[in-house]
Amino acid sequence: ADGGISNGSVSLAPRKSELYTTPPQEPTDSWLEHLCVHEFRHVIQFDKVNQGLTKGLSYLFGEIFPIAVFGVYLPMWFVEGDAVTFETSVGHLGRGRSPEFLNEMKAQIVEKGLYSFHKAVLGSNKDYVPNRYNMGYYMVSNTRHHYGSDIWSKAIERSGRRPYGINPFDKSLTLSIGNRRDSLWNTSSFRALFHNPDSVKKANYFYNTKRMLYRDNYSELQQIWKREAANCTHTFDTVPTHNKYYTNYYYPTALGKDTVLAYKMGLQETGSFVMLTHGKEKRITRTGLLYDYKFATDRKRIVWSEYRSHLRWEQAGKMRISSYDIKRKKYTRLRGRNNQFSPFKAGDKWGYVETDRQNRSYLVLTDSTLKHELWRMEAEDNEQFIHPSYHNGKILTVVQAPAGIRLESIDITTHNREKITQDIYYELDNPQPTDTNIIYRASYNGNNALYSLQNGTHKKILDSKFGLRFPSFDSEENRLYFSFYTSDGYKPGTATPQQLTSEAVDYTTYPLADEMAKQEQWQQTFTYDSVFPTRCYNKLTHLVNLHSWAPIYASLSPMEVDLGATIYSQNKLSTLTFTAGYVRQSGYKHGNWLLNLTYSGWWPILSVEFESGREDFQSFADGLNLQTGQKDALYVFNKSQRSSADFVIQFPFNLSSRQYNSSLRPYLRYQIEGIHHQRPKQVYGYELQENTAILYPVQKQDYHIYQANRYYQLMEYGLTYSNQTRMTEQEINPRWGQMLTGGFT
């Protein structure tokens, strides 16, 4: 998919991978290679599970059984932590070498201590808890560091080979560790981390090995990180903010004397631009979804890039340059066919990065109204422009290339490109040119720090315990603004030139990542030496993809499980899904045939639900006595079929914009249900004597019984409309919303 989202996923039922190929504005390895390596690791995990008894039972249940074992036994922090470890160990960068990724756990552990294992795994709406990727990376890699590279592989294999018992995954960890935990805690270097190592070891012990590893790993890392934090002595000023819960302030930028503009997002804020003045905060406007928080301003207007949903297709939305006139309070959005990122001010013009469907990257300049394109430059093959800025007729930008990441200066008039730094496998972004130097963020020292480049010499000028980013230099005040990370989020900071240092650059490695690379013994090198045949994808011939079958029927809507025999199909594009079979379903005493089918490949969504089964019922009927020629009243026990069909056509429209999630869904529904193929099993004569019903047996072959087929039809027209504000982590209900439903039956 070439929409505005940069992501990927792998599923096992059905077995497929989905890659969202638009590269993000993050300096990392080549996006497609990074994405494929991470997602392919999940494929390997699935294959590791699908062996032994699990593989045997997959012949009985199809692909649904391995994914059930996978979901029940493998914790998600391991699944994602292992994939992050692999992407880091075989890549040049990866998240295991990204301070932005690493510092979330560091800040929480150092400043707030260790949360309980359950809180770390399940998360919290009260406190910010780093996600399963962050927590899982340290769990997987640090455990491998102490207990060997195969400890997790054995756990997956045991879960697949023996998917019985309470927890084979945890049992395998227990067997793999054995007495080695005692050996680890007896080493002098490990004991030296703690004041009383024996008491810590005892407190960390749990019968659940995963829980024990969590305590051991993070107790060790806590001591290491505390010492690292104590060695950071840089000082700077903070811009006062007041928040009870976790809140981030991105890209603080001077908006006049004593006024700072920043993008705010947190547990109680979905995303908005705010002005900070003397400790007071004023919201300017809320925004839609931002995946990169970089914005630009000329102090009259704010320009940023936000996600614009497609009217119909979920993955076809684009990143669009949007602007807000502060004085007129007017919101506008730039149109275009491609994704637009990282706006910047270029004199009296505006600029941004554009990425097309082939992942070609462009620098674009427009006039002051953002309506007319004036200048465009295309990057070389496999290059991406990241976080450009402008100074004195030149665009300064980060360039991500296969050989590494570098800074470049591009002359607007001549289109001449000049390398300012050599290609290097460290993160670089947000270059801010001044009259005398270039200030940028880099990960040279294993942390997010600010550096200065002047006359070809790099110097570290500012650092903090858990990193700082998003520099912005105000030439009028001669002051540097930035965001520094804490366990309560990114906070705005500021420094004068006198507070900045001038330290030599220390190119630090990442010990844990390097150790994992040694264990893998493979460096990511892609050689394009083969050409594989391609052919057009035929949607018709690939419409059906049977992936699972089972002697049970399981439905999520409504939630029910019944015995039976069913097959499940979902094609690779997820346009056609259906479940078919014969099940012992509620409402049918003798079982019934069913078919639930949905086709989503066109704008309208077509749904069909069909059920048919035996229906026994009793009824009064008139019968012609073939011997006497009289019409008699009868009471009949019938054997018949009850069938129902429900056809629905929906026309979904996604009207979401800015801070509102909105949808409109007109629909047409036709339903028919009836009782047919009625056959009398037993027939009784019927008489009333003194208000008492008397039934007496008769021979059904003596009567011609009049019974019409029983059925009803329903035609329904209607629409549903929903509109509500996006919700924060802590909100139970939206701040504002409407739900309207109307129809005619």
Describe the function of each predicted region:
Residues F70-E100, K106-G178:
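Active-site-proximal alpha-helical
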Residues G96, E100, Y246-T247, K264-F273, ...:
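A flexible loop/linker signature enriched in serine peptidases of the S9 family
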